[in-house]
Amino acid sequence: GAGEAPLKENLAAAILMRAGWPEVARRGGGLIDPMTGSGTLPMEAALMASDSAPSLFREYFGFLNWNGHRAEIWERLLKEAGERKSAGMKKLPPIVGYDSDSRGVKNAVVSLERVGLKGFIHFERREFASCVPHPKMKDVPGLVVLNPPYGERLGELRELRPLYANIGRRLKEHFRGWRASLFTGNV
């Protein structure tokens, strides 16, 4: 939701690896993040599934000024990485991010352009209670991955119990056969 710290890209990538996303994507299964916030999980999922090299869109690396740096090799590697990403983007499974907060969705959409993913991920304002597989995801079970809000204090934990129960119900009722991965500070 709004005001929460966004998930770091490396942590999002680790969550997706642990959840089995690369295998789900290879099978053609899609990804839904029903509490997407700033959209980090769907964006990392797209980069991973498209075989994009980490930091491919970055323009500067410290080694570029190193005396031993060989620009021709670096340029060739960048070209190869760009070609692999282009080929991977053509085979990208459906990836969707939903959030109840319209500001988060707007920020996620803006971020898509920054990382070269505009048009490849669908973000939309939607309450968790109405999350179902996207119409493009009917054929192959995918992955639901979410980072729900979590409480630090005991009172907050009690307030979250209904949310976590609702998550379980929603997954059982509407995502049969799908994988699910929840990242939370609560056990």
Can you say where each PLM-predicted feature lies in the sequence?
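Conserved S-adenosyl-L-methionine
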Residues: L7-N10, A14-C131
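Non-catalytic substrate-recognition/targeting regions of SAM-dependent transferases
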Residues: G1-A2
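A short SAM/SAH-binding and catalytic strip from SAM-dependent methyltransferases
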Residues: V145-E152
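A short acidic, Gly/Pro-enriched loop at the edge of an enzyme's catalytic core
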Residues: S130-V145
